[in-house]
UniProtKB/Swiss-Prot annotation:
GO terms for biological process: translation. One of its GO terms (cellular component) is cytosolic large ribosomal subunit. Keywords: Ribonucleoprotein, Ribosomal protein. This is Large ribosomal subunit protein bL28. It holds the Pfam family Ribosomal_L28. The gene is rpmB.
Length: 101
């Protein structure tokens, strides 16, 4: 399991730990990842993803998982998130066609 957010693609970064005497040693800055279960309104089922806390705020800001995924670029999303996005788009399209008929 990689240390990468499935929604924002945030991953580990490399930097320096600087001591009082200004000695620099390499270290890794890891993202704050949490396992979260989102409820998709379009799919009507829970979706489990490993996301950063920054992504949690973004999902909340955009009105839930469906709104976030529909506005997100496919390049930033994990393959699992892209698959969920496609399912949401299909459900929304069928719901719109059913409403027109």
């Amino acid at each position: 399991m990689s240390r990468r957010c499935e929604l924002t693609a945030k991953g580990a970064q490399v930097g320096h730990k600087v001591s009082h005497s200004n000695i620099k040693t390499k270290r890794r800055f890891l993202p704050n990842l949490v396992n979260v279960t989102f409820l998709s309104d379009a799919l009507g089922r829970p979706v489990r993803l490993r996301v950063s806390t920054n992504a949690l705020k973004s999902v909340d800001h955009r009105g839930g998982l469906d709104g976030f995924l529909l506005k997100a670029k496919d390049a930033e999303l994990s393959p699992k998130a892209v698959d969920i996005k496609r399912q949401i788009q299909k459900k929304k399209l069928t719901a719109e066609l059913a409403a027109l008929a």
